[in-house]
Amino acid sequence: MVNQGQPQPNLYDKHINMFPPARARESSHKLGNANSDRHGLPAQNIVPAPYPVDDSIVELTPAIPFTSPSSSSSLSLPLSALNFTDGNADGGQLGTPVTINSNNGMDIFNSKPTGEIGYANNGTNSTGSRYELPFNFSSTKESLGSPAVQDASISSGNRISESVRDNSAPPPYEESESRILQEKVYRTEEKAPIRPLNNNPVPPQKINQPPTGSAKTDDNGSSGGEDKLSSYSPEALAFYQVYKKTITDSSKFTPEIQMQWCETLLTYAFNEDFISQYNINAEKLKRSLKPEEMLKNQKVILEHSFKVLTKLITLKWPPAMYLMGTLYSHQPYLPIKNKNIVIKNDEKALEYYCKAAKLNNSDACYRAGVCFEYQRGTSSLDPSPTKEQCIKKAFQYYQHGAEVCSNSACMYKLGMSHLYGLNMQKTDVLLAIKWFDKAAQKGDSPQTLYELGKIYEFSVLPPEIQNLLFANGIRKDSQLAIKYYQQCAKDFEYPLAQWKLGNCYEFGDLGLPVVAKKSIYWYSKAAAAQPKGNPMAMLSLSGWYLTGAPNILKPNNKEAFNWALKSSKCSDGKLARTEFALGFYYEKGVGCEVDLDLAKQYYQRAARMGFRKAVDALRSLTN
């Protein structure tokens, strides 16, 4: 397959706008098999958030799909047939291929708060009495998909200071005294007797949690006790373990334990299988709940999660502030299906990120930096900062996150800033490589590995960057570039690196041999990546279907057209080569009916992006 047209700027070469995901939570915070969103194509329009959506890292099981969504035809070989004669298997066992030819001041972090954050008291000053056990709340029916929690204390139009304030607004959930009075005691060993007519005092009943091994049944038909755990689902068992740990910690209110409980509640509130079978007390119900009962159960769980989160924020627990920021930005790190539990507010998201960053939360440093870099949530700051001031703040947050908090995402951003220059930031290629190396050593930054691969591939970088690298003694090293690409593609399932390996095996770049099976394999991995796949890999599969590969893949025009169409949808029509390919297919009737009007439309899209072949094709159609 031959490249068409003159070399064009590659939208993916300089991926400074692509950011690493939030760091993985500690293993103790992993919540069983909680379901997460999976988005298919076509790509949905998502409201811009304070930081870009990242590339998900998802294990591709079962095997890679070799058909486009709109067709039932498939490759002429199963995935199991992709075993290579050289003894390597790219499906996880492929070794590193062998080539053929051998600031400013940090004043925003130095000041300290002078008092407590002025959040709502929530009915008590105790850390134990209100949080000893989960509560049951009376609730009204709400849509299962939209249990919105409002914050009426501060409007989004109010101007705020970007620094940490002692009297900032409370989180979205704020309970009233009447709500507190409505709460029910968790459990008693037996129901309290009716008061006698003679008004003689009755000794109070002792309130206990269920003894280990008990299997009591309450009025709602729920049953608990460890003798019933054998019937629990794996997800419910994971919930029960967190619940049990939380109950044990109720008198201490240890932030780490309570934070895990809060995250668990937020996650499980949107797990329909769980909320239809279990309640907040980790008890399995005798029957599945009806939809309206599930709504009530969901609201109970959500309300309590915000009670715990509010309490943690009043204690100035940085992860809680960071979590609140992610909820306000509608980009939570938790697998929350409905992000509208909190009204989107970029200004308040930035405020919470800054609070958490000031307390050295590494993820908050990164997100605060991104917010300032792209001026998300900065319009309400007083005074309103200029673009240059925002860039300066962003660099400060990245620097703090990298140097103080050892955050690999911040190291990556510093590397990109020094390599390409962040607005007015001076380029320093050696310092960029230093930060990339540090991030790579932490083992959780695939973007860094990809950038290092590009640096040692050399020719894909802008000429001015190549000159700077050459002047500092950095030369092209194909073997080192392949090593970084291979590690990034295998260890992190990073779609760009997978596409790159497919491209190298297709055209024999970086000293690799032309191997059709390996090329198709890596393209397929990248095209099937979550959340929406890589559009360049989809276009490359279109090319393989158009030409075929002897003894590997039969030509299939329909599949060629479908993969090109999928690439266009995935890239939102912003990949010039894809738009040109669709114009060609419609003009020639490859895998579709001839449609010259559509052909012109696609050619025009590609031409507007500077694709020379499209300009020539338009002239040919009009003559």
Curated annotation (Swiss-Prot):
Sel1-like repeat boundaries on the chain: 318-361, 408-444, 495-531, 576-611
Domain of life: Eukaryota
Keyword Repeat annotated: yes
InterPro entries linked: Chitin_Synth_Reg (IPR051726), Sel1-like (IPR006597), TPR-like_helical_dom_sf (IPR011990)
Compositionally biased region (Basic and acidic residues): 176-193
Any Pfam family hit: Sel1
Taxonomy of the source species: Eukaryota, Fungi, Dikarya, Ascomycota, Saccharomycotina
Source organism of the structure: Saccharomyces cerevisiae (strain ATCC 204508 / S288c) (Baker's yeast)
Alphabetical GO biological process terms: fungal-type cell wall organization; positive regulation of signal transduction
Name of this chain's protein: Activator of C kinase protein 1
Composition bias type Polar residues, residue spans: 152-161, 206-215
Alphabetical UniProt keywords: Isopeptide bond, Repeat, Ubl conjugation
Comment field (misc): Present with 98 molecules/cell in log phase SD medium.
Residue(s) of cross-link: Glycyl lysine isopeptide (Lys-Gly) (interchain with G-Cter in ubiquitin): K184, K191
